[in-house]
Amino acid sequence: MGEMEIMAVLKAALAVTAAVALILLMSYWAAGRARPLLDASARDALVKQGLAYQFIDLAAGTVHYRLEGPANGPLVVLVHGFSTPSFVWNDYFEPLTRAGYRVLAYDNYGRGFSDRPKGPYNADLSDTLLVNLLAALAPNEKVDLIGYSMGGATVTIFASRHADVVRSLTLIAPAGLGSVTDSKIELLKRPLIGDWIVRMFGLKIFHGAAAEDAKAAPNPARFLADFDRQMDYRGYGEALLSTLRTYPLGTSEAAYATAGASARPVMVIWGEADKTVPFAQSKALMALMPNARLYSYEKFGHNITFTQSELVSGLIKQFLASLEAKPDQPAQTAQPTQTAK
């Protein structure tokens, strides 16, 4: 093959490569704009349809929240996990408000009906959201924080930074105490290729994972519909990807140690069949929070929050009631560790 022929082949190869790259770039760009923005008109429509509650403008964007219960009741704040927004707490409002508590749940940035700022979606962003939200809705109040999965890490980090605001912690299958090796997640963390996968296929991936969780929910169809609705708007996949890359999902031990050094009451609830945040990590948690009360359940997994809401809300009410006991009427205390079969 002569020099001219070699040059022709190289030019053809470069042309094909450039064409493929352009196609990939255009598909990436188009996929990012295939869904509408979550703007004021979209939120108004959600409220009119009875799908959303209240909104508030905070430093990094608009936040969707639900606040119910007696105005003078102790404030209980419910913090959701990595991908499922605040609807995961829907079954907790009735029992907790009936017990006299004011209950607040909200969508973290990038989830549910809250804004999708550019990020990074790290611990500082979620912490600032909660700081700003409490300053706006409950200034100068002490709160009882309840966190599920990544929300467990969020409330623990908050307690380690703002100890004077937190009366108690309830941690349900809390993340932040060790990483679970997953080749798929490691692939998503890689620059460029992870961005492209999430932009092109991320919503299908997240829907598939939610569909598995929904099978055990009391109302699977309702759960999946509520989960999918947040994906109707631009930015959800990118928010989760940024969280995977920048949030200390497996490396929050220092915050647990700081929060655990306090005399603040802590309750931990965990399913021993949890494959997302393995129950084995409870050993590390109890070493960092030796005064915590641990309740574990052999047959339940990571979805214990929404599959066993009656059980979990009952434990929460019992725990919170113990904080309200009068000095001359001591509350019934649980053993530091309790395992239920």
Task: Describe the residue ranges of each PLM region.
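Acidic catalytic loop of the alpha/beta-hydrolase fold
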Residues: 248, 272-277, 302
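Alpha/beta-hydrolase fold catalytic core
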Residues: 2-74, 98-101, 253, 321-341
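Active-site loop/oxyanion-hole signature of alpha/beta-hydrolase fold enzymes
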Residues: 52-61, 66, 98, 108-146, ...
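Conserved HGGG/HGGXW glycine-rich cap/lid loop of the alpha/beta-hydrolase fold
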Residues: 61, 68-113
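Short beta-strand/loop motif that positions the catalytic acidic residue
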Residues: 262, 268-270, 274
